[in-house]
Structure formats: structure tokens, C-alpha cells
């Protein structure tokens, strides 16, 4: 899928925590959120990330108030910039430990879509894109890594 001129790449990733965020078994994940988010913010190609009052998104409850549902939403200049962050930084190690902290999702949990440069998506907008991907599969409206032929790093890690 070609990137439209004047657009950036938005992504939403959701997951259900195995335990409450305050549970000691979640400490390695929760205690490193600021570190990993800070790393993302310093990466070439990073544009923006959603934050709630916690400074991350750990307190956002978009799914019927479920305290164990977590979201991550960000905007990047392009798919390559996002892929380099996800697969070529310490983030990859945390992704590799995801089963320690997150339940296995039965359905899609990751979506990407193009946004006009300068647009900051809302959580509701992102959830609507994820729902669209679930219902209709990849399209110009909502897609996954397979729709970005230039971004190949995900193939070795089997993301989304």
C-alpha cells in the first residue's frame, strides 16, 4: 500500500493484561513504560503518541472500563520508521516477553491507517479503524503489516 502524499502512519495496538497493572507480576512491564515510550519519542520518524494523565496510556479504559485492557497509539512518518523502532530497538525484547504480561488475543489487536500530517487520532477513531479491519480485512481504510510491502522487519517476529 502506497503512502499518500502529506500523510503519516497511525497505529493502534491493544492487549489485555494478564493481571492488574498494580500486580507485582506486571512490574517489569509497567516500570519500563516510560523508558520504552521515551525511546520511541527520540527515534527518527516518531511524530506523536497518545498519553493519558499517567503519561502513558495505562489508565485509558476504552473497552467498557476494563482495567486490564491496555492500548498503545502513535503516529510515525512512515512504516519503515515504525518498523525500525519495533524490531530494531529494545522494544523487540519487550515484544518477545508479551506473553508474560498479556493474554493471547483471539482476534486482531493491531491496526494501521494513514492520517493527514498534523492529525492526532482519537482513541475512538483508532478503535473504529480496528473494528473495520476485523470486519472487512485490510483496505486503504485500515490495514496491517502485510499491506506495507516496504516494511519487512515484522516477518521475522510474526507481528499482528
Segments from the language model and where they lie:
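Short, hydrophobic/aromatic alpha-helical segments in well-folded domains
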Residues: 32-36, 71, 81, 94-97
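Helix-adjacent hinge/juxtasegments
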Residues: 60-87
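An amphipathic, aromatic/His-enriched active-site/gating alpha helix that lines ligand/cofactor pockets
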Residues: 79-107
Amino acid at each position: 500500500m502506497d503512502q499518500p502524499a502529506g500523510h503519516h502512519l497511525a497505529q493502534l495496538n491493544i492487549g489485555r493484561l494478564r493481571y492488574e497493572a498494580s500486580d507485582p507480576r506486571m512490574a517489569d512491564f509497567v516500570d519500563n513504560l516510560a523508558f520504552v515510550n521515551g525511546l520511541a519519542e527520540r527515534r527518527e520518524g516518531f511524530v506523536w503518541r497518545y498519553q493519558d494523565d499517567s503519561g502513558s496510556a495505562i489508565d485509558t479504559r476504552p473497552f467498557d472500563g476494563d482495567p486490564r485492557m491496555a492500548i498503545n497509539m502513535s503516529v510515525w512518518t512512515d512504516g519503515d520508521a515504525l518498523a525500525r523502532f519495533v524490531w530494531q530497538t529494545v522494544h523487540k525484547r519487550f515484544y518477545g516477553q508479551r506473553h508474560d504480561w498479556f493474554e493471547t488475543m483471539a482476534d486482531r489487536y493491531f491496526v494501521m491507517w494513514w492520517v493527514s500530517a498534523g492529525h492526532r487520532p482519537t482513541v475512538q477513531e483508532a478503535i473504529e479503524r480496528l473494528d473495520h479491519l476485523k470486519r472487512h480485512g485490510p483496505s486503504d481504510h485500515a490495514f496491517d503489516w502485510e499491506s506495507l510491502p516496504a516494511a519487512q522487519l515484522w516477518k521475522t517476529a510474526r507481528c499482528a
